[in-house]
Amino acid sequence: MLTSDLSNDLANPLPLAQALIRRPSVTPIDAGALDVMQAALEQLGFTCRRYPFGEVDNLYARRGTASPCFLFAGHTDVVPPGDDDAWRKPPFGAEAEDGVLWGRGAADMKGAIAAMVASVQRFLDTGEPKGSIAFLITGDEEGPAIHGTKAVLEALADEGETFDHCLVGEPTNPNVLGDTIKSGRRGSLNCTLTVTGRQGHVAYPERAENPIPALLDLLGRLLARKLDDGVPPFQPSNLEVTSVDVGNPTTNVIPAAATARFNIRFNIAHNGDALSDWIRSEVAKIDLDFDGRIEADIHVTGEAFLTPAGPFTTLLQDCVEAETGRRPALTTGGGTSDARFIQLYAPVAEFGLVGATMHQVDERVPVSDIETLTAIYTRILKGYFKDFPA
């Protein structure tokens, strides 16, 4: 049975989008958002399974067992709204006024999830698919992303579950609906460098071991390397230092330790292991003239990937163009998403709403964009099950 604030007319995406936004599902809190999704999908004939890991809950739903299987993927968790009083509309009020839907998650990405569900209802109204449709909805995308899509995919693989293509509903469009489809993403590596010395008075440097010169030397070596010139359609890889800290507000004390943090966004010319080895090799070249140590704490949060242009991406472009009049570009820029996990299991692309206000105060989207996105998703389902045989 559907929740009381959700219309039985699932072909209309707005009531479902509002019901989801009214759940304050700030990572890792679900607040009933997945219950709303499960109720809607069960009404459409999906078999639903929940996958709780740690503090996070996740939902996998499938309708049918035959191939090909088309997977919709997304997340119901949202970032905190910040100061509620700074919003023109309540962040979890889901008010629709003058053709605009307001609320945290409207753009990223509860509006797109509602469009996915509505598109399935509209598609099923025309007949049964020659294959299967599935949903993977996580509550851990905006957070560490450890207990979300990645963990569910691993569990599904252990159970023998497979799918053939995936569309993620991230807000890929920077300006207007139909701008861009994400056909790949850069990889991401985080590193914390720590040089440990010995604290002392600046007037007696012989009694101290200053870690700062060694840290600056190491950062200089890392920054001196041009990683690449870009690999189309990827932009050049970049290393950005994000902080340098010594925890020392004074001018007469040599600090005991110095720390720097940086991130590398890398294209398919690199992988996480090779970059990690390079960082460690540069660390090994630093010759400390005192009895200290240098540590590099490296975490690769995602590898670069690309879904090559082909029948799947062409289908997506054709359907977007048919509904918007714009031919979307296939791009790979921006941050990471859960597509970095999905690409290990099936070809994946991303297309959703306009992201201009995502994560901001007064997040909002035109209701007409949600309707158009529903029409695009419906057209994609029709084309997919017509042109992609088992």
Swiss-Prot record:
HAMAP family: DapE (MF_01690). Homodimer. Zn(2+) 2 binds at residues 108, 142, 359. Pathway: Amino-acid biosynthesis; L-lysine biosynthesis via DAP pathway; LL-2,6-diaminopimelate from (S)-tetrahydrodipicolinate (succinylase route): step 3/3. Its EC number is 3.5.1.18. Belongs to the peptidase M20A family. DapE subfamily. Disulfide bonds: none annotated. Catalyzes the hydrolysis of N-succinyl-L,L-diaminopimelic acid (SDAP), forming succinate and LL-2,6-diaminopimelate (DAP), an intermediate involved in the bacterial biosynthesis of lysine and meso-diaminopimelic acid, an essential component of bacterial cell walls. Transmembrane segments: none annotated. Binds 2 Zn(2+) or Co(2+) ions per subunit. It catalyses: N-succinyl-(2S,6S)-2,6-diaminopimelate + H2O = (2S,6S)-2,6-diaminopimelate + succinate. GO terms for biological process: diaminopimelate biosynthetic process; L-arginine biosynthetic process; lysine biosynthetic process via diaminopimelate. GO terms for molecular function: acetylornithine deacetylase activity; cobalt ion binding; succinyl-diaminopimelate desuccinylase activity; zinc ion binding. InterPro entries: ArgE/DapE_CS, Bact_exopeptidase_dim_dom, DapE_proteobac, Peptidase_M20, Peptidase_M20_dimer, Peptidase_M20A. It is an enzyme of class 3 (hydrolase). This is Succinyl-diaminopimelate desuccinylase. Gene3D superfamilies: Zn peptidases. SUPFAM superfamilies: Bacterial exopeptidase dimerisation domain, Zn-dependent exopeptidases. The keyword Amino-acid biosynthesis applies. The active site is at 77, 141 (proton acceptor). Keywords: Amino-acid biosynthesis, Cobalt, Diaminopimelate biosynthesis, Hydrolase, Lysine biosynthesis, Metal-binding, Zinc. Zn(2+) 1 binds at residues 75, 108, 170.
